[in-house]
């Protein structure tokens, strides 16, 4: 039987609030939150560290990695398609199969063009489905054993033509004239492209098919070939879009032809059920990273980190002189080290910085209200296993 969750606002401790300022001095905690916000299990804690002198307001969720009652899930801006929404609305729209949401933070940086607004900059895996390809920045994922990982991830997605030659492809993104991009229904009702050649693909006999997963080779049959863009999308089809400049350098296919789509990444994320991009890395092997001067400005920040025992979701309020001025990257990295993180990475910050826990947004967004984000990382209590009858 599940225990009721009770979150306790912990007394601020030097070990939790010690962060390097530009002179790398320790924060001195002069105030701490005292409001009860819910209930706790021993494996889950939420705290708000407040320092009135700097000032700083830092929101932290800590979860025990050894506890097997939780997992992570990512969200999409529009629930099932790319887009933008505030974190609290993304949590509400999370599929029931993810489990009961306990905490969430905003996720990756994102595409801002109108047609593909909310497309994550780097890799996202949602319930095992790959939403976007990695772009080489720092990304986070969990392996099947519940072990967190962080490194730069690279795409080797490609289409393999009938003659055996291969062409690199993007996924659910802006297609330039010299590019090839694969689209799934995550993009929306159509590809939203202009010009080029587009192949509507359906499942070939005995081939794995949708939802699209990393580490597969899909054999697809061309259902239709179109000499214009904006091809329709459905849950059982994909569209391969070829830009007009590239079209003259790749084979022209007719309906009934087959091709292959390889969804490889480096490192291999085929076993990951959840992944989200961001960056840069903040802490590696227990040591804070170093950055050039332009990253030494204080802003609201969102980060995640872990050690062998605990996983942390962290948000630092900023741009509010009476509440919290924010942190530089060195200050944030030092704070995460003081928490005990051996690995940690940055996520989108600024006005996007949001931490939701136990039913409500706990931080003070810098723009006075939540700003829409492309995705979020959500901590959920697993759904109980169905009992046998």
What are these regions (language model features)?
Residues 1, 5, 23, 27-28, ...:
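A detector of low-complexity, intrinsically disordered, Ser/Thr/Gly/Pro/Ala-rich segments
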Residues 2-17:
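Bacterial N-terminal signal peptides that target proteins for export
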Residues 15-25:
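Bacterial N-terminal signal peptides
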Residues 27-389:
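Gly/Ser/Thr/Pro-rich low-complexity, intrinsically disordered segments
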